[in-house]
Amino acid sequence: MSTKPKLAVFKFASCDGCQLTLLDAEDELLDIAGALDIACFLEASSRVVPGPYDVALVEGSITTPHDAERIREVRRQSKYLVAIGACATAGGIQALRNWADSQEFLAAVYARPDYIETLATSTALADHVTVDFELRGCPINRGQLVEVIAALVAGRRPRTPNHGVCLDCKRRGTVCISVARGVPCLGPVTQSGCGAICPAYDRGCYGCHGPAPQANVASLAEHWVRSGAGPAQLVPLLRNFNGFTPEFRRVSDELAARLAATE
Amino acid sequence: MPDLLLQKGDLQLLFDRLSGDGFRLVGPTVSQEAIVYDEIASVGDLPRGWTDVQAPGSYRLEPRSDEAFFGYVVGPHSWKKYLFPPLATLLTADRTDSGWAMHAPPEPTEKYAFIGVRACELAAIKVQDRVFLEGAYVDPIYKARRDRCFIVAVNCTQAAATCFCTSMNTGPRCQAGFDLALTELSAAFIVEAGSDSGRQVCGQLPLREATPAERAAAEAARAQAVAGISKRLETEGIRDLLLTNLEHPRWADVAARCLSCANCTMVCPTCFCSSVGEVTDLKGDHVERQRQWDSCFNVDFSRMNGGVVRNDVRSRYRQWLTHKLASWIDQFGQSGCVGCGRCITWCPVAIDLTEEVAALREPGP
Ligand code: SF4
Ligand code: SF4
């Protein structure tokens, strides 16, 4: 019997992009396959070895009663559970439903809404089970995923920095697009992990890796409002892949209330 | 040596001379809607006809009405990115049958000529020299680059709204620490040599002695920069002011605005903090020890066994400002601030350290 750690990959409500990152780790894939027994990874192979597993990488958010049951089973079967991606760590873009009436959506989309069983919200795995490690991002970063796997194989803590995106812009010499062009950018309050890609391509940060620790989102939003950006622009910026995290949610709710008051 | 005159059309000859001596030219150039420092090939890469308009939290690149080569102030980059690189490999190690084989990275071979260094930046390089070269430990990465660089300074002939070098006694006139210093006039540069290598280069350029009228014109151009400075930092008793007001209510006030995003420390030409970590391959057979720019504004920067020491924005902003303006004096015998104004311009929420200090001078309510 193999003594290599048994790895399983599971998917909930998600786009598959984060699991694809594992397949995308082409340079490391052979080493990963050598170091781990990939016991369940449906995107790569139909071979499924039953649990328990040493490590589970779990993608996706919890959006149905069935999901809520299944994540508990995954937890029971897994020694070390890693939530991967914004869906699994924050509810994902589909958490936009949390501000709307999901029954209304069902009625608009499906001919027979009564066939569909869904929860009113899309929520993070940690809202349902204990999560051992959260790897953020929409999608996750390949280098960070390899780091997490390398750390698990070596039996050490993964090293995924939690500082803001600005540090990465500065290290790579990107000129701040917020200061030099007045573009609202979530970089100062967003956790690093992407390598600060968007500002290097003239776009403000979308907050893909979620709020940085102790993020002062309210001050950043106030500054934009003073500089002339209205809540109508700022609310959608904050309600994105990580919009339902408490830090982003609190401020987008405040701005939305202000917007409603002026309408 | 008397002041000399270099016709603008001959500026390229200076660049050719330096390239011919094996220097890689680094200087101002327009990129990403700003005037940045990057490798340049010829005078054609200089930001001729461009300027910067700066205010707290705001920088705009704008065209000038003339063709000045150096008609701007300081931008988002500083020379520290060449002397103290943002990412450096300190050592690599490979697992072998007989244990770990360690390798020091190769010595850098490139030598830089910095074109357009301002007085506050000369002062900032001096501050970092003190940190990296003059203490008990000499940083070999900084030293290798610093020993070999050639500095062409440029005297400012205008100031930004964020400049306060006059408060810090660092400018705007370049006094020392350069090989050559230029003052830009409309058709020529007045050239001063500040070192033997500078004088040697002068000897190989078609220069003539400046006339009294040309020297007066240079003096007048430099006076415009002094006249343009409106910002002031009162430094009288600043060390004691900061260190005896650690519980002043202003710290909580600034913490409510500060994002702890670290931009101020990254753009500051004197901030020198870094963190060192090991990066391994998946098998753990190859390890690189890397040093990266880091900042006292990052939560994990003060993480020690047992937890984070400065676990809120208030304590981190206070750490930065008191170090920069007060305990730096105890540590290095001078202020850590040269008055370049970068931290004011590049703060995404327009926090201005001179205003914070002024508020700390007022008794709390
Ligand atoms: S003072 Fe400004 S630039 Fe510095 S950490 Fe605070 S918000 Fe960021
Ligand atoms: S503290 Fe600010 S003004 Fe002073 S040297 Fe640093 S960036 Fe320039």
Language-model regions: role of each:
Chain B
Residues A255-T265:
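Extended amphipathic alpha-helical segments enriched in small hydrophobics
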Residues M1-L243, P249-W251, C271, L282:
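Iron-sulfur-associated redox domains of electron-transfer enzymes in respiratory
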Residues T235-A256, S274-P365:
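Ferredoxin-type iron-sulfur electron-transfer modules in oxidoreductases and energy-metabolism complexes
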